[in-house]
Amino acid sequence: MTASPVLGNLFIIAAPSGAGKSSLIRALLEKHPDQSMQVSVSSTTRAPRPGEVQGVHYHFLSTEEFEQRIDAGEFYEWARVFGNYYGTSRKVVESLLAEGKDVFLDIDWQGAQQVREHHPEVRSVFIVPPSLEILEERLRVRGQDSDEVIAERMAKAQAEMSHYHEFDYLLVNDDFNNSLASLEHIVLAQRQKMPHQQIRYSSVLKELLG
């Protein structure tokens, strides 16, 4: 049985800081080492941090180059955060999808709105913590932020979570393994939808139907 090439699926994975999004995505990729799934590498104008590698963690661009790409319409979505640009490259995403890879966009609800304008078929997942108390505890365990910064993050998290209803799926990350299984089911089920299966098994269907 020969399967025909098929485009990968595009997913938006969004969550407030501390909900466990990055850990879930990382664990899902580790479960599928065949590289059939991949996180899109964003572009940014901020300076690389120690240990960050060009093209692996981010595509680092100058402000001038980033703004030129905005004018040329080369981003699905972009935003300016604390004086630095961040964006999702059309070319990067479309190249990965053409290779048949499922692509995850790690963006916020505002970026999700922009992406839906270009990719109405995108599937989106919003991840939330089981409670505000647990979210604050997770932020404090990191040991990276002051009380003031944590308070700001909590306020921002509540504002972000008010947009949960704009997404296709909602995951409450109260148990990591259960949440990982749910995220995996969402991704794998999308691969079985009719448009993809019709392309993937076009030769089989042609033979069966004569």
Swiss-Prot record:
Residues 8-188 form the Guanylate kinase-like domain. Pfam families: Guanylate_kin. ATP binds at A15, P16, S17, G18, A19, G20, K21, S22. GO terms for molecular function: ATP binding; guanylate kinase activity. It is found in: Cytoplasm. GO terms for cellular component: cytosol. SMART domains: GuKc. PROSITE patterns: GUANYLATE_KINASE_1, GUANYLATE_KINASE_2. Its EC number is 2.7.4.8. Keywords: ATP-binding, Cytoplasm, Kinase, Nucleotide-binding, Transferase. It catalyses: GMP + ATP = GDP + ADP. SUPFAM superfamilies: P-loop containing nucleoside triphosphate hydrolases. The keyword Cytoplasm applies. It is an enzyme of class 2 (transferase). Essential for recycling GMP and indirectly, cGMP. Belongs to the guanylate kinase family. This is Guanylate kinase.
